[in-house]
């Protein structure tokens, strides 16, 4: 199935039905009075997150989604039937934005999470509501309200703990295939990966994290070169970025330092917040470097790149160094999660609305002695 991570659709909620202006006409009831019922409400448009869906392809060509209108009210105090709601099922990780106002309507981060994105119109009132002591046969009634109408943008941002960055053929897909059960396409030509891949890395019982591999970036991606930088949105929810560098390129004219700097520049052009995320350097394909040259090549790269953060040396093909990297990643994610939970608990404690009422001190006389009986 083709991977689609962005779509624009129009959602139109149903209009409310009109109220009825009807009079009761019945044998032996000379003054029946008003009996017009209310109109039914219009159907709403509801978005639901579904973990069994992983693309927005259903909304790439179905551009308009309409809910049913409410029925009009009728005589004999009969209310109109409400319009049926329609449900739009979307992948977990989808954000819904109003294109006119820029308002973020919903961020679907949990399975079965539902959000109303267009509300149906209210039904009109029948003339039964306008009866009074001075107006016993009202002819007034109200029309139903129109349903909400919106143009919305759907964006899918995959949910992952760790994201992989790197040039095409840096070994990102080989790495995710080595440490997880993901089966990405792997070949010796650029842009083998055309869509994000997710893999679950297990480091022990009940100890795992999710890793995301996106198509490779090249210099000028911000201007649309290669596949552009559209897939970088899938790294916005991650807590850690692994910058994978090919330390043994096939072409001797390729400069790993220049390529690594180009990746960082493209990251910064796309989103400053993404650029400031924790980022580790992973030097890959060390199995292709002679052992007596490894230390010198690594030192020369780090000096040229000007990097002073965490560095890991691995071979995704042979698995060398991958286990230690995965354990370090899990420890980082666990520590970050614990710190986040502690901060949330602190915020909650500071936001207590009802505190225990303090006890009033016991009354005593001015002299401090028991009162005389």
From Swiss-Prot:
Boundaries of every Obg domain copy: 1-159
UniProt region (Disordered), positions on chain: 128-147, 354-373
Name under which the protein is recorded: GTPase Obg
Cofactor: Mg(2+)
Chief localization: cytoplasm
Broadest EC class assigned to this enzyme: hydrolase
EC number of this enzyme: 3.6.5.-
Binding partners and assembly: Monomer.
Functional description taken from the UniProt entry: An essential GTPase which binds GTP, GDP and possibly (p)ppGpp with moderate affinity, with high nucleotide exchange rates and a fairly low GTP hydrolysis rate. Plays a role in control of the cell cycle, stress response, ribosome biogenesis and in those bacteria that undergo differentiation, in morphogenesis control.
Gene3D superfamilies membership: GTP1/OBG domain, P-loop containing nucleotide triphosphate hydrolases
Statement: the UniProt record of this protein carries the keyword Magnesium: yes
Sequence ranges of Low complexity compositional bias: 359-373
Pfam family, any one: MMR_HSR1
Biological processes, Gene Ontology terms: ribosome biogenesis
GO molecular function per UniProt: GTP binding; GTPase activity; magnesium ion binding
Species per Swiss-Prot/TrEMBL record: Paraburkholderia phytofirmans (strain DSM 17436 / LMG 22146 / PsJN) (Burkholderia phytofirmans)
Gene name of the encoded protein: obg
Family: Belongs to the TRAFAC class OBG-HflX-like GTPase superfamily. OBG GTPase family.
UniProt keyword annotations, A-Z: Cytoplasm, GTP-binding, Hydrolase, Magnesium, Metal-binding, Nucleotide-binding
InterPro entries, sorted: G_OBG (IPR031167), GTP-bd (IPR006073), GTP-bd_Obg/CgtA (IPR014100), GTP1-OBG_CS (IPR006074), GTP1_OBG_dom (IPR006169), GTP1_OBG_dom_sf (IPR036726), OBG_GTPase (IPR045086), P-loop_NTPase (IPR027417)
Binding site for GTP: 166-173, 191-195, 213-216, 284-287, 315-317
Location of the OBG-type G domain: 160-334
Recorded GO CC terms: cytoplasm
